[in-house]
Amino acid sequence: MSLNVKLHPSGIIFTSDGTSTILDAALDSNIHIEYSCKDGTCGSCKAILISGEVDSAENTFLTEEDVAKGAILTCCSKAKSDIELDVNYYPELSHIQKKTYPCKLDSIEFIGEDIAILSLRLPPTAKIQYLAGQYIDLIINGQRRSYSIANAPGGNGNIELHVRKVVNGVFSNIIFNELKLQQLLRIEGPQGTFFVREDNLPIVFLAGGTGFAPVKSMVEALINKNDQRQVHIYWGMPAGHNFYSDIANEWAIKHPNIHYVPVVSGDDSTWTGATGFVHQAVLEDIPDLSLFNVYACGSLAMITAARNDFINHGLAENKFFSDAFVPSK
């Protein structure tokens, strides 16, 4: 069975056999529509069903209002007939192919008790192409976890990852207690549609915890291109000592168009900077977001709260781009 899937407003058409999800069918055809977690948790792949029938698995993301408007999640919906969808399509990703690469652990730096900075070296013949902001799956002993790439494309070709220690986490235990330098690993990627769009709007980057990793990659890429858009970086952590890098402050000092506000959400008597929820700090400084693009990376709770509050403060819904960290299943 071959079913046609037509995308609006791009007019792109691809086929599905009806057994794979709409998202997988699109990616198999090298058609890049919006997605992130691929398991129905984050909602990035939300689309509007214009015509046709789909079989959708249950999910907790879509509201009754979403369903009434014809919204589906392409990562957990399968076509039952020819269908037409209103969904974002990104030709910028058409030249990028997801592959599995061997790599070695070139270096690992532990910062405090719960952050590890990994640098992975690929073979000289393996040239991974990605856009700043995308993520990879790290594969160790047959298990995999998704991590955002923390460095811009280019440089020495290494892949930088920021990993937070998770209590009783199987993968955390491997990374923090078992990994050895030069150990052979594998990565699969790049993946995701989290990248900076090419327009002239000023940018708000919103990061929670190691959600700073893709922000670092995207800002580095903007600096490398001498992009002069106004950039506002807000990075939230529970306490002042949790900030594991000072590079954002260095950017702000060196580049007049880059502005940085670290935000502490917990009880920290030594902290003299911004406090509270990181997205609320944005609204205190920029109460009208109607002329901004927002890129947010962090917990699903942070992403959801930021999206709702930012839209209530003028942000166009299609100007909010996110990559939510969701627990492994």
Curated annotation (Swiss-Prot):
EC number per UniProt: 1.17.1.-
Protein name (record): CDP-6-deoxy-L-threo-D-glycero-4-hexulose-3-dehydrase reductase
Pathway listed: Nucleotide-sugar biosynthesis; CDP-ascarylose biosynthesis; Bacterial outer membrane biogenesis; lipopolysaccharide biosynthesis
GO BP field: lipopolysaccharide biosynthetic process
Source domain of life: Bacteria
Function: Participates in the conversion of CDP-6-deoxy-D-glycero-L-threo-4-hexulose to 3,6-dideoxy-D-glycero-D-glycero-4-hexulose together with CDP-6-deoxy-D-glycero-L-threo-4-hexulose-3-dehydrase (E1) in two consecutive steps. The detailed mechanism of E3 is not yet resolved.
InterPro entries documented for this protein: 2Fe-2S_ferredoxin-like_sf, 2Fe-2S_ferredoxin-type, 2Fe2S_fd_BS, Beta-grasp_dom_sf, Cbr1-like_FAD-bd_dom, FAD-bd_FR_type, FNR_nucleotide-bd, MRET
Coiled-coil annotated residue ranges, if any: none
Subunit structure: Monomer.
Database matches in Pfam families: FAD_binding_6, Fer2, NAD_binding_1
GO function terms (MF aspect): 2 iron, 2 sulfur cluster binding; metal ion binding; oxidoreductase activity
2Fe-2S ferredoxin-type domain location: 2-93
Ranges for domain FAD-binding FR-type: 98-197
